[in-house]
Amino acid sequence: MPIADVTLIGAPDVPSDALAQRLADALSTALGAPRGTTWVRLHRVDARDYAEDGGAPAGVLPVFVELLRRGWPSTVEERGASLRAVAEAVARVCGRPVAQVHVLA
């Protein structure tokens, strides 16, 4: 059962129409999880409440995904592919570049 905490920085640019549901559906597909087993908790953080040492680059609004999952793939390659699929799914749903999606697993 995957559980994801998704934090959007500077979130007003992302349409909120059923965003948590769209993320849950996309993550379920990306992870190959059975229907009804992927949970998402969505957080929005104002860009003023986010910082990087030395200052965040202009226009960079990251998305952080903290992912708990039982039964990760056994090989490093398969796990990497799974994490890439998660980042790509979140980027697509949120309309952010995949390079700005950070998956913590």
Write out the residue ranges for each language-model feature.
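A domain-level signal for the structural core that forms small-molecule/cofactor-binding pockets
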Residues: 1-105
